[in-house]
Each structure stands twice: as C-alpha cells, then as structure tokens.
Regions:
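Active-site and adjacent substrate-binding regions of carbohydrate-active enzymes
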Residues: 1-245
C-alpha cells in the first residue's frame, strides 16, 4: 500500500508521542494511520489518480524497489512494535518465533528463548534498522516480491518501471542474485513489456546487462562522482567539510 501520510487519511485517532519519548510502541496516532485499511485503500486510489494525471501530461513514473532489505518498522519484522497490538496483523519476526515472517530474515541467534523481541538478526551492513531479506530460505518471500514487481506495473496502477535499490546486494550469493533478477525481469516484462528496470549499482554492471536482468543502471561512476568532485572537491561519500564552499 501507499503510506497514508503521502496519500489519504480517512480515519485518524490515537496520540502523538509525548515530548522526550522515542518509543514507537507508544506512537498510537501513527499506528492508527498506517494500519487502518480505509486509509491504505484510499491512498492507493489517490496514487492511481496521480499516475493517470502524470500520463495525461506525457510524464512517466517509476517506483523505488527496496528488495534487498526492509525497514525495522515493516510489519514483517516490526522491531518498532507498530503492529504488535493491531488485531488484523500477524506478529512480526522480531516479536514472536511463531511469526509467519520468521523465515524472511536470518536470525543469528534463533533459539526459542531469544524471543520475544529478538534483536539478533542480519541487517544490511550491520544496521539493525535495515533487516536484510533472507530469500534463499524463503520461497514464499521470493514469490511475494515477484508479485510486487508485477503488481505496480499492471493495471490499475500502471507504473512505468522500477528503480532497484542496492540491487547487486540482494541475496547471499552472486549466483542467487542473478537468478532472482532474471525471474524479476520475466515477471515485470510479462506484466508490462515497456516497464523500465533501472538498478542502483557502483562499479562494472556488465554481468547484469546481458539482456535478461536489468535494463540499465544509475550512472554514479561517470556522472555523479565526477560532478560531485567538481562542485565540492570531495568524493560523494566523504564525511569531510570544506570551509571555503
């Protein structure tokens, strides 16, 4: 679904966090907004209207597909405990060992006594706010992401393609990575042959650009890096600060 904060809030309720409180488990207003089905469905309808208007004006729209990892607030993990007490949602993998999403993640400590609230999972680059998705151990997860790839480029949404976040990092091995993107391309192009598959990638992307995976890549090496250096005198990811700029 489209986040209602960017879409439509039909039903509101709950309370904002008090000053000084950072526990999202108490963010009842946020919880009400993002778990209420009426808000989610209304937001999707608004998105359909947005895409129709963009196309009427001769414009295209692509979505950012973050399929290597999710956020700690995602209902699959629910480390922020947003969905824990919502009656229409199953427990996240952080909450319960019986979560239907447990296999979506690799838990470094997976004995039953580590739950509830098991923080010992693989995060992308070690970030616990970015739980890495565990495709190799979950056919269900793979099939769901392929479904997502098809869904948004198909009617009634009719998005014009995908931008794939850290696409080369997906999966645990290079072999699986290529296998997945071939399946993803087949799913997307079957739904919408004109959909663009644009990957975020640093370095040589040639092994993914053989006609059966990505269409193209974001041109970091030949555009963003030199332009950043020209404008700032620093590499794009530098933490340095130049006082004369």
């Amino acid at each position: 679904y489209i986040d209602p904060h960017y879409g439509v809030i039909v039903e509101d309720g709950g309370e904002v966090l008090p000053d000084g409180v950072t526990d999202n488990h108490q963010a009842t207003k946020y919880q009400k907004r993002v778990t209420e089905l009426k808000n989610l469905e209304a937001s999707n309808r608004l998105f359909i209207e947005l895409v129709e208007e963009l196309h009427r004006r001769g414009m295209k729209i692509i979505l950012d597909g973050v399929f290597n990892h999710c956020g700690s607030f995602n209902k699959w993990m629910d480390r922020e405990r947003i969905y824990e007490n919502q009656k229409d949602y199953q427990p996240g993998a952080y909450i319960s060992p019986d979560s239907p999403y447990r296999s979506y993640f690799h838990f470094l400590k997976d004995d039953e006594e580590e739950w509830p609230y098991n923080p010992n999972y693989d995060g992308w680059w070690g970030h616990d706010t970015l739980p890495k998705l565990n495709y190799e151990d979950s056919v269900k997860l793979e099939n769901y992401i392929l479904y997502i790839g098809r869904k948004w480029v198909s009617p009634p949404f009719n998005v014009d393609g995908w931008r794939l976040d850290v696409a080369a990092d997906l999966g645990q091995t290079n072999d699986y990575n290529h296998s997945f993107w071939k399946k993803f391309r087949e799913a997307v192009k079957d739904a919408n042959p004109n959909a663009l598959i644009l990957a975020e990638h640093y370095g040589d992307p040639s092994e993914w650009l053989q006609g059966d995976e990505w269409d193209t890549v974001m041109n970091y090496d030949a555009f963003m890096e030199p332009v950043t250096w020209f404008l700032t005198g620093m590499e794009k990811h530098s933490d340095e600060h130049m006082e004369d700029l």
